[in-house]
Amino acid sequence: MAKKSKIAKAKKQMAMIEKYADKRQELKAAGDRTALAKLPRDSNPNRLRLRDQTDGRPRGYMRKFGMSRIKFRELAHQGLIPGVKKASW
């Protein structure tokens, strides 16, 4: 389980990214680098670290499922993820 402060920071960053997304897109299209630099740092989506939705784990994140490899394995073994089954060959 990640620290609660880190999870809260990630949520705050997501809100800021959504808030400035349109403005950032317009400035990028216009090529106005100085105005882009004046936007808040956390409004840049490259600074966001994707985290597990259930426990906030930052590493081993699987984008397709929105969770870490550990949670994915637990839920897959329980059969709670549709379309996922254990491979055997």
Curated annotation (Swiss-Prot):
Q: Which GO terms describe its molecular function?
A: rRNA binding; structural constituent of ribosome
Q: Which UniProt keywords apply?
A: Ribonucleoprotein, Ribosomal protein, RNA-binding, rRNA-binding
- Ranges for region Disordered: 29-62
The UniProt entry, under InterPro entries, shows: Ribosomal_uS14, Ribosomal_uS14_bac/plastid, Ribosomal_uS14_sf
Keyword Ribosomal protein tagged: yes
GO biological processes: translation
UniProt lists compositionally biased (Basic and acidic residues) regions at: 49-58
Q: Which domain of life is it from?
A: Bacteria
Instruction: Provide the Gene Ontology terms for cellular component.
Output: cytoplasm; small ribosomal subunit
Q: Which SUPFAM superfamilies match?
A: Glucocorticoid receptor-like (DNA-binding domain)
A Pfam family of the record is Ribosomal_S14
Task: List each coiled-coil range.
Answer: none
> Which NCBIfam families does the record cross-reference, listed alphabetically?
PRK08881.1
The entry's family comment says: Belongs to the universal ribosomal protein uS14 family.
User: What's its job?
Assistant: Binds 16S rRNA, required for the assembly of 30S particles and may also be responsible for determining the conformation of the 16S rRNA at the A site.
Question: Could you describe the subunit structure of this protein?
Answer: Part of the 30S ribosomal subunit. Contacts proteins S3 and S10.
Q: What is this protein called?
A: Small ribosomal subunit protein uS14A
Q: Which species does this protein come from?
A: Enterococcus faecalis (strain ATCC 700802 / V583)
Q: State the taxonomy lineage.
A: Bacteria, Bacillati, Bacillota, Bacilli, Lactobacillales
